């Protein structure tokens, strides 16, 4: 089951698991489809080095720590507006690598759903959608080694508009309190038999 992201589904006029290549390609030039707190574009796959792993973990955790969101890989943007289709490889090795990076470089691991949307004119290429729900298990930390000097071992990102912000210690404490309160509330609900 694919996560429901209301604003983005409204943009396409359909559920994310029903998207085809053409619907995504038609976003080019649409200011309604500009990057925001629930939408981000990458023109290519993340690099396979430490910096790429850190960036992928940060982008995914930022969505999970905020309101959820959609990352579209294979679309360039100009000032946040989708500007050009740049198909990416959709092979199993790429999908396994992304899964391994997210599981190994976020704590707790961020749940997400990959959707490969193939270009009918170029089999094996197209868009890779990473659908990230808002996570009840947050806050999620990035555990990948920092590519820039940082005093923090665990870094907690979240979306702030079309950018990534970093949670302060107070924000992290508040997020943990909310997680534990929600878990306690679920535990107190009457069980159906």
Regions found by a protein language model. Name each.
Residues 1-193:
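Conserved N-terminal catalytic/coupling substructures associated with nucleotide/phosphate chemistry
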């Amino acid at each position: 089951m694919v996560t429901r992201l209301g604003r983005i589904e409204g943009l396409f006029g359909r559920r994310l698991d029903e998207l085809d290549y053409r619907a995504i390609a038609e976003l080019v030039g649409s200011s309604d489809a500009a990057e925001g707190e629930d939408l981000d574009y990458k023109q290519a796959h993340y690099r396979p080095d430490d910096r790429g792993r850190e960036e992928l973990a940060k982008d995914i955790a930022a969505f999970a720590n905020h309101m959820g969101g959609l990352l579209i890989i294979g679309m360039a943007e100009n000032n946040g507006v989708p500007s050009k289709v740049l198909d990416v490889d959709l092979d199993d090795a790429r999908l396994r690598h992304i899964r391994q990076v997210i599981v190994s470089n976020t704590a707790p691991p961020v749940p997400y759903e990959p959707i490969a949307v193939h270009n009918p004119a170029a089999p094996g290429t197209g868009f890779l959608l990473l659908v990230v729900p808002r996570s009840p298990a947050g806050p999620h930390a990035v555990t990948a080694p920092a590519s820039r000097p940082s005093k923090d071992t665990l870094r907690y990102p979240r979306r702030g508009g079309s950018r990534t912000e970093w949670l302060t210690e107070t924000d992290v404490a508040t997020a943990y309190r909310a997680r534990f309160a929600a878990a306690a509330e679920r535990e107190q609900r009457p069980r159906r038999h």
